[in-house]
Amino acid sequence: MKKILLLLAAIVMLCVVVSCSDDDEPKRGDGVFTVNTPMINHMYNTVTGEVLGLSNTHNKLTIDTAKHTASLELVYNNGSEQKLILKDVTAKPKRLGFYELSSPSNAQFRGYVDFNESSMRYYYTTESGLRVISTNAEVFFLKTHNVISYNDTTTSTDMSNVMYEFTFTPGMDNAIVKVMGITHAKDVKYFNSITAMNVPYTITANGYILSGQNIPTTARYISTIDTTMQTVKTTTDYPFKTFDVTVDLENDYLDAVYMMGSSATVVATGSTYPDYASY
């Protein structure tokens, strides 16, 4: 699916360059695409206060990138499979390949599609009061602010643009966490990625809380002082000694505090898209 969305992103960009047609019956080449995307439904009953388990779903999006319109078939399960069909969706371009979605007939709906990052997210509330947030299996935060304090308590580092990715699977109690692009100044290492395969999490009304201790990780890094061509090295020396993270889907917010082994503590905040934090 990610390859399909990346291909669509390239086609979307090409359509912008050649100025796609605005005919009443546009062809696929005119910028009309249909994508049936596997997604994860996060559900919360606003009437009873019950937080429901995650479920797999497929949501169908048809978007006309020339006319900035779309239609959606959103599938959710509340005892039985049900659908919310929106035929009057406005697809407002915010930047190349990124569209903010809204519906004049359904004020409870909002969302976005980002062909650049192969990402979609839909928010809606059903007539029965079920709040549904549909996300890709991977929930990521592209822009963050990070303060890294070292164990001698005398130094710290401020970093932006560290990326966080969380993968949730229905029926599983553990998530996959990946931290990308973080520098450990004291150990002179730049980490391409630090990956933890089994991070315990709970589902909340707004998203997820991830928490654990001594969580094994696999880290890929290069030296920050070696200016020669380097081969990426792998280490398991930076487990998450402590890990406490709030992923707030409803408000698109990340709040994280974790330890890289015993040598550094990271405090991170951020959002998926800082320019469009409120969809």
Regions found by a protein language model. Give the residues of each.
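Bacterial Sec-dependent N-terminal signal peptides
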Residues: 4-6, 14-40, 129-140, 256-279
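N-terminal glycine/threonine-rich, aromatic-flanked beta-hairpin/loop signature
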Residues: 50-85, 158-195
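Contiguous, well-ordered beta-strand patches that form the walls/edges
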Residues: 71-115, 185-239
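Short, exposed beta-strand-loop hairpins at the edges of beta-sheets
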Residues: 118-130, 246-263
